[in-house]
């Protein structure tokens, strides 16, 4: 599901709320989550999961086109850990 599909589905389910308001709310929520992570803070949504940053240590990689070795710097990457309720709901497809 893409962001625009999410907005469309929410707007359909919440027909009493204008679609533009739903779009603005979704975009604002995602922007707030991104800025919270960028500040190094953790986000926890009970029953859904938590977002945090994990550190990736510096390493030697390879350029896929040339095969040359490339030194990659350490960096923080977003990480999502699903909550138990979400894992249980997703498990019906397993």
UniProtKB/Swiss-Prot annotation:
GO CC term, one of those recorded: IHF-DNA complex
Record protein name field: Integration host factor subunit beta
Cellular location(s): Cytoplasm
InterPro entries in UniProt: Hist_DNA-bd (IPR000119), Histone-like_DNA-bd_CS (IPR020816), IHF-like_DNA-bd_dom_sf (IPR010992), IHF_beta (IPR005685)
PANTHER family found in the cross-reference section: DNA-BINDING PROTEIN HU (PTHR33175), INTEGRATION HOST FACTOR SUBUNIT BETA (PTHR33175:SF5)
Entry's family note: Belongs to the bacterial histone-like protein family.
The keyword Magnesium belongs to this UniProt entry's keyword annotation: no
Pfam families named in the record: Bac_DNA_binding (PF00216)
Record function comment: One of the 2 subunits of integration host factor (IHF), a specific DNA-binding protein that functions in genetic recombination as well as in transcriptional and translational control. IHF in combination with the datA locus promotes ATP hydrolysis of ATP-DnaA, called DDAH (datA-dependent DnaA-ATP hydrolysis). IHF binds oriC as replication initiates, dissociates within minutes and slowly reassociates during the cell cyle; IHF binding to datA is low before initiation, rises after initiation and dissociates during the cell cycle, allowing IHF to coordinate replication initiation.
GO biological process: DNA recombination; DNA replication; DNA-templated transcription; regulation of DNA-templated transcription; regulation of translation
Source organism of this protein record: Escherichia coli (strain K12)
Gene name in the database record: ihfB
GO molecular function: DNA binding; structural constituent of chromatin
Subunit structure: Heterodimer of an alpha and a beta chain. Part of the relaxosome, a complex composed of plasmid-encoded TraI, TraM, TraY and host-encoded IHF bound to the F plasmid origin of transfer (oriT).
Top-level taxon: Bacteria
Entry-linked HAMAP family: IHF_beta
Gene ablation phenotype (knockout): Increased in vivo levels of ATP-DnaA.
Spans through the membrane: none
Main location: cytoplasm
Keywords, in A-Z order: Conjugation, Cytoplasm, DNA recombination, DNA replication, DNA-binding, Transcription, Transcription regulation, Translation regulation
